[in-house]
Amino acid sequence: MLCTLFLLLLALGIVQTTRPCFPGCQCEEETFGLFDSFSLIRVDCSSLGPHIVPVPIPLDTAHLDLSSNRLETVNESVLGGPGYTTLAGLDLSHNLLTSITPTAFSRLRYLESLDLSHNGLAALPAEVFTSSPLSDINLSHNRLREVSISAFTTHSQGRALHVDLSHNLIHRLLPYPARASLSAPTIQSLNLSWNRLRAVPDLRDLPLRYLSLDGNPLATINPGAFMGLAGLTHLSLASLQGILQLPPHGFRELPGLQVLDLSGNPKLKWAGAEVFSGLGLLQELDLSGSSLVPLPETLLHHLPALQSVSVGQDVQCRRLVREGAYHRQPGSSPKVVLHCGDTQESARGPDIL
């Protein structure tokens, strides 16, 4: 795909030249490789006003910026002219879009990156992205209230998909139908922070590796809330102002979790080390800005792979291996402890004592 190739060629050197362009727009040609054998066109038509669409663009355009144009609607006729079918990146952010038609992107068969952030979108048509091999969709800062996971079914052929739904009004996320004709969306990164979710949504069967629920009004995290997310490696539950306690074994469905962020939860109380039961691969734990101050020995017992913990205000604890003054006896294990100090001290402290 064009975006992937673009990133691979960055290391080979870039030469930028200006090309003739539609009045008001800027067209830059970036050439790569030996003897400038490959080129991409980036067209910037931002901040010109709604009259700019549909705008003619060069046939070999890879990225089009239509941001900040006060656009109120986007449909197939706006995005269907010559040069649009090979687009790899499209920026429609900071407009006045309140809706998009189901076929708006149907001709963009090579589109990988789509930015619809900072608009007024209240709903997503079903299967609106199915024609494009998208790998990155930014829908942050809109007015979405109810979103169906099936809306993110793309023509990606198994490639990872990153979806940003942060800063919306989402109170309900509809799970993917178990008997759907199309395969489940390949969402690996999902940002749901700062919405209106009162419970952890059902995300089972998604190949998630990153999930953020920061800033939602979650009142509790029920047992089994993360069922079906065994591949998750990074979970952020920061700034959940309403949550008071975590259930014992609440994360046991996440055996592959490596990073857990529980920072900024001032009402969250310690409920025992059983909360972290089953997190045998967890390496980073952030408890800063919360009332959780567990004993280091307790954490290491339940989290054998733990490398660092943030607690209180600017206190960082790091995993240390104490070798002692004498050589260990054959078969004995070194003593592992958590050494805590301010962030600067932890940054320069040794790993082995």
UniProtKB/Swiss-Prot annotation:
PROSITE patterns the UniProt entry points to: LRR
Limits of the LRRNT domain: 18-59
Gene Ontology cellular-component terms listed: extracellular matrix; extracellular space
SMART domains noted in UniProt: LRR_TYP
Signal peptide: 1-17
Known role: Contributes to various developmental events and other processes such as wound healing and cholesterol homeostasis through its interactions with multiple signaling pathways. Wnt signaling inhibitor which competes with WNT2B for binding to Wnt receptor FZD4 and represses WNT2B-dependent development of the peripheral eye. Plays a role in regulating the hair cycle by controlling TGFB1 signaling. Required for the development of the anterior commissure in the brain by inhibiting neurite outgrowth. Essential for terminal differentiation of hippocampal neural stem cells.
Name listed for the protein in its UniProt record: Tsukushi
Source organism of this protein record: Rattus norvegicus
